[in-house]
């Protein structure tokens, strides 16, 4: 019986340690290669995504990945279809994020679930990136 209690306590301690220290690990940003966007362009878009995911209470961001020039160029028309009247974007950029939902008090999230969401951002003539939509693609 004592051995079973020790094993249960060790497992519980392991879970607590993972839960406490996992938030300390910074998210990875995979900028990839691009012939149309500078590293700073990709970083500023990824920063917007990171800030948004980090605002989701209890969620832990693991990675933000640039989906490449071809995907980004191909989605400019889609991004313009999301624009408010009178706005025409000249550039679009697409990322995928990987994050985990809260273990406890998950609310609308599935508890402790891994999410991979697509993010569509656009801008006009080198201006500031705007997040147009995100979620499951």
Please tell me what each predicted stretch does.
Residues 4-113:
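Flexible low-complexity loop/turn motifs enriched in small/helix-breaking residues
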